[in-house]
């Protein structure tokens, strides 16, 4: 049975010691969906939103969030990210925005939490910018899509 890496033998939470690990190239992709009314999505896409460019703001928020993940999640290591990318795609057929984030580095620990944080905060930023016109926006399906590098190998979500 696999054990939790952040829990010591006394059951206490601790930051994992990665000092003996070798640096490897690590990459992670995550996604989130933001579901809204078609009128709200059209407002974003037409540039008619009174707060400005929703996608540009969400993209920058996601990038900033990835860089600050270690400050938000208590046992995450501060990482020297070499790449953070946040892509937003309008999906009018399901009245949603898909947020995809990609984080990469060469280091001793993975970037899954950074990718998940980037996607989550970008989605929350879309909500924040649009809540004046629609309060019941739904953020859903936040998940890790893929991770590579490190001892645990390559993971691809089904």
UniProtKB/Swiss-Prot annotation:
Catalytic activity: (8S)-3',8-cyclo-7,8-dihydroguanosine 5'-triphosphate = cyclic pyranopterin phosphate + diphosphate
Active-site residues from the entry: 128
Enzyme class: lyase
GO MF term (any one): cyclic pyranopterin monophosphate synthase activity
Name of the gene: moaC
Cross-referenced InterPro entries: MoaC, MoaC_bact/euk, MoaC_sf, MoCo_biosynth_MoaA/MoaC, Mopterin_CF_biosynth-C_dom
Natural source organism: Histophilus somni (strain 2336)
Protein name: Cyclic pyranopterin monophosphate synthase
Function recorded in the entry: Catalyzes the conversion of (8S)-3',8-cyclo-7,8-dihydroguanosine 5'-triphosphate to cyclic pyranopterin monophosphate (cPMP).
UniProt entry tagged with the keyword Lyase: yes
Stored NCBIfam families: moaC, PRK09364.1
GO term, biological process aspect, one: Mo-molybdopterin cofactor biosynthetic process
Gene3D superfamilies in the cross-refs: Molybdopterin cofactor biosynthesis C (MoaC) domain
Pfam families, alphabetized: MoaC
Binding partners and assembly: Homohexamer; trimer of dimers.
